[in-house]
Amino acid sequence: MKTKKKKKIVFVCTGNTCRSPMAEIVFRRLVEEMGLTTLKICSAGLQVAPKSKINEKSAQTLIDKGFDVVRFKPKQIDEKLLVESLAIVCMTDVQRDLLMEMRWQAMKAAGEEEIENNVYSFSELAGYEILDPYGKGIDCYHYVFELIAGGMSAIIEKLLPVGVREKYIPKKRTSSPTKKTTKKKENQEA
């Protein structure tokens, strides 16, 4: 089977309700600002509950940061996404390891001639994992948003073709104003 040109980047977390929706929505805006209309950005989860919705705190965080979440609906990762994606970015190394095996099986089943690694963890691309804020306060969701947004320039640099990425690589990563607050809280608790 001949390999189709892949134009989809997928962000993956556990339930597609907290982290990966934030990554999808932030990265989509960057791609639109770059004028890359043929590149499709989406997200999916490893274990998506039926009729699930974006987490209220994730939605509120995105709204607080100026993003629209009205049309977002969580979806389960499937063989089609595994086979048709240019890149799959998982929030953790454990998720990456699981998806690499799933993708390899899906590619073999689809009769793909070449099976290149296109499954990455956020830490491979940006230097740190994105841990799950589920069950924590809104400040934690804002912190996770800052981590995700801060890693986007590294993801652009490592995933997009050379001629494309030079058109738009943010001059500096978004800093997290909550990092100092978090360190202060940790020091106070110690």
PLM regions and their residue ranges:
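Conserved active-site segments centered on acidic
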Residues: 2-84, 157-168
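Hydrophobic beta-strand core positions in alpha/beta domains
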Residues: 11, 89-90
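Short, exposed beta-strand "edge-strand" segments with a Pro/Gly-rich flavor and a Y/T-containing core
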Residues: 49-54, 72-77, 89, 116-118, ...
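Helix N-cap/beta->alpha junction signal
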Residues: 81, 92-94
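Phosphate-binding/catalytic loops
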Residues: 87, 94-175, 179, 183-190
